[in-house]
Amino acid sequence: NTPGLGDLAWTAARVAVFDGTRTSCDPQKQPGAVVKGILSPSQMPLQIRKDFGSNMNDSYWLSNPAAPLTGFAPIIGDEGTARALRTRNGLVQIEQQLAGGGKFDLARVQQFITNNRNYSAELLLPEMVTYCQANPVIDGVNVAQACSILAAWDKTENIDSIGAPLWREV
């Protein structure tokens, strides 16, 4: 890392800034790595389980919340931080399917990845509707019609889901 800006970038955002004019900043070859500049397989997260593993395009850390993966280089992903709604939604759906002995087959996986559930709506919509029904005018704006639309919404992002565009603007 470079002094000054590099130190600041690392402290603020864990972004490494290297001085490309110095050979000490060249990528090094790690033991076990095929070429220099990459990590060896032993430095990468791997999880083999009988229940499930997942990839939600988020950090490897909670591929399965029952067995968090920890201790890897920060460049691979973060640990101990809040997961994105997409990840949380996926993990909730997996747990719901597996509860009571449910399994995944091709049809269930296809349904799982195309069901268009809006997890933020699942978490927040009931309280939002209760609030706007009790307060149909907010800051001088009548929200009664919007509230009715949200109350009838199926909490999905399907093309015919009337409440979805409105929810995205809330």
Per-segment meaning from a language model:
Residues 2-170:
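Long, compositionally biased non-active-site segments enriched in small/hydrophobic residues and glycine
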